[in-house]
């Protein structure tokens, strides 16, 4: 769809705690460039950003700012959503998933001041 759709078209406001990632309408140019490489897009609730941040901190001892944790949503959805499991089946990927590695482009976190980290760690949204 590239720039033919906006977040408002699907009932979202565009207001987010992940302000560095907020894009109300995708770029037509970038959409065209990415089309051969992209199988889908997703949205993530702000509350999940903080949940993923706490999970990564607890299990991996890695602190990422909440917006960087949006990258976690894709692999999570692969296991939770039937339409994505169907995509995997339809593309003959079921046998490969056991050896799959999900690489997350997760920048951010090392320069977040300690008091802001604590605020993030104690942020709970719906």
Stretch-by-stretch model annotation:
Residues 1-36, 86-126:
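Glycine-rich phosphate/pyrophosphate-binding loop at beta-loop-alpha junctions
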Residues 25-94:
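Active-site-adjacent helical/loop segments in soluble small-molecule enzymes
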